[in-house]
């Protein structure tokens, strides 16, 4: 028995010895250097191994004849080789090219929150910093490229007027994104930051989808369908809010109402002005969002603001009342074969009535309305090609009456665009777009080509170059006075952007140049399109999170040199709203549930016919206390040192300053549901 077992073992060993053992060996490189950790194996078997630190591999197999090898490695394209050779193999792998949808070109744009292609900073971090006091516009003014114009608080970008920056909600235009106020008092943005999952601020060089903005665009994307019910309140010395959401299976309905009143604050801390009626704003908003399918979503929004204020000015009692209504509805759906369709409609209406506007006993009335229609088709054809094309129409109506003088103006703007984003080679990307626009009152078509080259060698570094042409119609007053024969203004942008980013720091440097053509110019008592101008400079933005634990520091600096011949200027002059130097330093430090913030803002003096203003400086502090997941207390003190900043000079040489040197704000956010306080989101 034992002998039989021994014979069987000997026969099995002989059979194994007779089976051919083949050694497969070689090296793996990327064409320049050896690659370690590459998985090399024979397809259809378990035979294989990982390459060593020198890129070498060697394993045995029972396979004979022709072999099909595959090599896989993170960040590289899979490599397949069919060969009869078993040794001294040389496998050359290629780095996996980034798909066009995976690239986020940061050139001349800043992104907050989450949008279709961006995921960076939460909107709460942006708003609860510095002196923003919950205002998107004030928060964005901390970025490089923006100018400090304290007497109205609007966005001025890279030497451009405030109306050269246009706002879009879900891709649809907003005619008037600001609240109103009396002269020399700062306004606020009329939208809550908590409405949006993405705030994407472009300082210039934007694509063909957007138009009618000579300098910049501010596209904001509202949140999607809410997954749960929400209810929350917030209160401060100047405003009171309540907002909530009812969530359904595949849809949600939201509301928000707010009352802003300076009456209590003015009673506690009077300012320099004589108010006959304190500033008050009553606003309400509602949203309905529905997921029709996995690839289709409908979003609707409607908002209404009523603003009222009265002020004693010299020998008159100015009384202002404004109604501002904005509504939009959009549909985004997959229409098959990889195509995505976007359609939208928006309506903006603004009604202004002012008594004692300029002199005692006069009356000013202005009604503006805009209907915006838009359709766009998008498709990703391959990892290297992405395209979109669309058309839109702006239908505008404006009436103005000042005592016996006035006008009634109607016109529309047609536009079409085509955009293509291409991956030229693995690290080089090209964005091409063309936009054509026509104003009905002159019938002239404008063709505006735009191009962006982006070199993205790795996740840390980006280098981009942007050129493009942009257009915008003049203000309604100028079009009406010219008898609807005023050519559109245009601006040519050239931008170079360099960005280096790691987990601990960010550095961005952007030189730019803008050339303006056909600006409105007062000539012989009427307006022509013979004005021109230029704006050049550079922006620097740095952020560091490694100075100390829980400490975040930022610095933004802008240099701008602008010159224009427009409006009633008699020679090319630096516009009075621009300052040559703008600098802002911020620090944010967290200890447990408390976050401290400190910001110092500086702007050089602005030039006026009656002189140059002193430099602007404001040291601001804020504190956020996360009392619990449902309660947040936020406070801020602006201009701690109490410096009296001069914003500009009147024609008689008198200085225009803020209505108060310091402003203190304290507010509380409370969630009445199970979600976190900052999720009440005014929705």
Which sequence ranges carry the predicted segments?
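Short, acidic, small-residue-rich periplasmic hinge/interaction motif at the N-terminus
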Residues: 29-31, 39-43, 72-76, 84-129, ...
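Periplasmic-side early beta-strands and strand-to-turn transitions of outer-membrane beta-barrels
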Residues: 213, 225-228, 242, 247-320
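Face-selective signature of the C-terminal outer-membrane beta-barrel domain
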Residues: 254-255, 285-307, 318-443, 450-456, ...
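Membrane-embedded beta-barrel scaffold of Gram-negative outer-membrane proteins
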Residues: 342-352, 456, 462-464, 488-545, ...
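Gram-negative outer-membrane beta-barrel transporters
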Residues: 424, 513-515, 529-606
């Amino acid at each position: 028995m034992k002998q039989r077992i021994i014979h069987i073992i000997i026969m099995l060993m002989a059979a194994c010895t007779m089976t051919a053992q083949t050694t497969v060996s070689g090296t793996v490189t990327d064409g320049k250097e050896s690659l370690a950790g590459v998985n090399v194996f024979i397809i259809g078997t378990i035979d294989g191994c990982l390459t060593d630190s020198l890129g070498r591999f060697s394993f045995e197999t029972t396979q004979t004849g022709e072999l099909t090898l595959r090599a896989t490695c993170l960040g590289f394209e899979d490599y397949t080789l069919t060969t009869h050779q078993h040794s001294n193999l040389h496998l050359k792998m290629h780095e996996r090219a980034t798909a066009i949808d995976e690239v986020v070109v940061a050139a001349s744009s800043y992104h907050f929150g989450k949008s279709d292609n961006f995921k960076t900073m939460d909107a709460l971090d942006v708003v609860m910093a510095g002196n923003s006091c919950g205002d998107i516009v004030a928060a964005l003014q901390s970025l490089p490229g923006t100018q400090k114009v304290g007497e109205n608080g609007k966005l001025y970008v890279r030497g451009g007027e405030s109306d050269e920056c246009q706002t879009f909600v879900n891709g649809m235009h907003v005619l008037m994104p600001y609240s109103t106020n009396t002269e020399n008092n700062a306004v606020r943005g009329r939208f809550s930051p908590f409405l949006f999952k993405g705030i994407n601020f472009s300082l210039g060089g934007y694509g063909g989808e957007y138009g009618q903005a000579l300098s910049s665009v501010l596209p904001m994307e509202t949140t999607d369908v809410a997954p749960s019910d929400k209810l929350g309140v917030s209160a401060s010395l100047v405003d009171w809010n309540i907002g909530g959401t009812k969530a359904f299976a595949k849809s949600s309905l939201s509301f928000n109402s707010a009352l802003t009143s300076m009456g209590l604050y003015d009673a506690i801390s009077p300012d320099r002005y004589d108010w006959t009626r304190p500033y008050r704003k009553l606003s309400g908003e509602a949203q309905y969002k529905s997921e029709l399918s996995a690839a289709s979503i409908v979003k609707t929004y409607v908002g209404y603001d009523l603003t009222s204020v009265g002020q004693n000015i010299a020998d008159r009692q100015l009384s202002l009342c404004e109604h501002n209504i904005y509504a939009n509805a959009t549909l985004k759906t997959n229409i098959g074969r990889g195509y995505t369709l976007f359609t939208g409609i928006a309506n903006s209406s603004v009604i202004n009535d002012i008594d004692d506007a300029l002199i005692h006993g006069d009356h000013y009335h202005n009604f503006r309305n805009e209907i915006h229609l838009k359709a766009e088709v998008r498709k990703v054809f391959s990892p290297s090609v992405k395209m979109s094309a669309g058309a839109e129409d702006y239908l505008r109506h404006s009436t103005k009456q000042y005592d016996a003088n006035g006008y009634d103006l109607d016109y529309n703007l047609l536009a079409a665009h085509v955009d293509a984003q291409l991956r030229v080679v693995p690290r080089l990307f090209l964005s091409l777009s063309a936009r054509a626009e026509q104003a009905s009152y002159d019938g002239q078509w404008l063709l505006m080509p735009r191009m962006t080259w982006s070199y993205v060698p790795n996740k840390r570094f980006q280098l981009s170059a942007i050129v493009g042409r942009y257009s915008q119609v003049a203000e309604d007053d100028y079009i009406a006075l010219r008898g609807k024969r005023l050519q559109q203004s245009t601006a040519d942008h050239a931008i170079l952007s360099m960005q280096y980013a790691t987990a601990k720091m960010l550095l961005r440097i952007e030189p730019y140049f803008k050339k303006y053509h056909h600006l409105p110019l007062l000539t012989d008592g009427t307006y022509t399109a013979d004005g021109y101008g230029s704006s050049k400079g550079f922006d620097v933005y740095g952020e560091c999170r490694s100075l100390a634990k829980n400490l975040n520091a930022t610095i933004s600096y802008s240099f701008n040199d602008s010159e224009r011949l427009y409006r009633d200027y008699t020679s090319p002059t630096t516009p009075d709203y621009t300052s040559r130097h703008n600098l802002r330093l911020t620090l944010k430090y967290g200890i447990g549930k408390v976050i401290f913030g400190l910001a110092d803002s500086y702007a050089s003096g602005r030039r006026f016919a009656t002189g140059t203003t002193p430099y602007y400086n404001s040291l601001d502090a804020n504190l956020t206390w996360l009392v619990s997941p449902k309660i947040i207390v936020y406070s801020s003190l602006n201009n701690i040192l109490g410096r009296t900043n001069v914003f500009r000079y009147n024609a008689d040489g008198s200085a225009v300053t803020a209505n108060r040197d310091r402003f203190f704000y304290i507010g509380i956010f409370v969630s009445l549901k199970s979600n976190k306080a900052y999720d009440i989101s005014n929705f």
